[in-house]
Amino acid sequence: MRPESSAADRADGLAVAADGVRAEPPVTGPVHPFDADTALEPAGDGRWRASAPDRWMVGRGPNGGFLAALAARAAEAASGRPLRALALQFVAAPTGAPLDVSAVVERAGRMTSAVSVRIEQDGSPQVLAFATLAGLPAGGIEWDRTEMPRARPLAESPVVRLQEAGIPAFMHNYDMRWALGGMPGAATAAETGGWLRTTEPRALDAPLVAAMTDAWAPAAYAATGRFFAAPTLDLVIHVRRPLPPPGMTPDDHVLVRFSTRLSVAGVWEEDGELWTPGGELIAQSRQLALARERPRRSAETARGPAPGSRPE
């Protein structure tokens, strides 16, 4: 069953078709590379086909944030409502081959929808996700005890250089300015972050926010001063404000902060935050990842999904 279209749904920047399925905004100019890369080709009855371009690869497979973006796009398409929460389990590491994406509206209530998403490859599950979607009705009780991280201004933040041959390909899709915490490999802080935007300016929406929660170099690199494989086991994303945030333009960067506190037997957590330049919290994330020694020249396999049962 599809939820009815409502003013609350449309108020969050989604165009909703008459049957409740999210309609893509009309194309009035060139398609942004991110939209082209994360496009879902309809395959009928809540199913789509997708591909993972080489520029989103981490080693042999796509970046976990890219896969999260596909899941976010499918969940919104199936429900016709804006994403509020997305929990992803990376059960295997897909290759660059075509992907099959499916979404099922498990429940559509008056205000919220629950959607399950599967990303498969050659009939085998790669990512299992569950999404909560809802508009933001007027009259909700609000409070804000958040505090924006202290960071260097954008103009004073050095560009993160990505010329090294082993840098994961997907990081070239972003303009990254280091502004807080430790640089990767510094062993000076248990947090890292800075200003982040797509290389070509683009307004924030749920798929892009999902991708950004897994875009920065792992906080573990700043905490340990070492580089190692850091595949993601699971990732949870909470979207805290309407998208795009009022007052933000496509040219604006978001401030990101990622931190870690504990690794036991190579299993570690990372907490993430995305902020507007004006100091409003946009989204929060937490992921559980692995820290694995592997002879390599660089951080080439960072930020990929865990391999699951796939042979190395």
List each language-model region with its residue ranges:
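Terminal targeting signals and extreme-terminal segments of soluble enzymes
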Residues: 2-4, 10-312
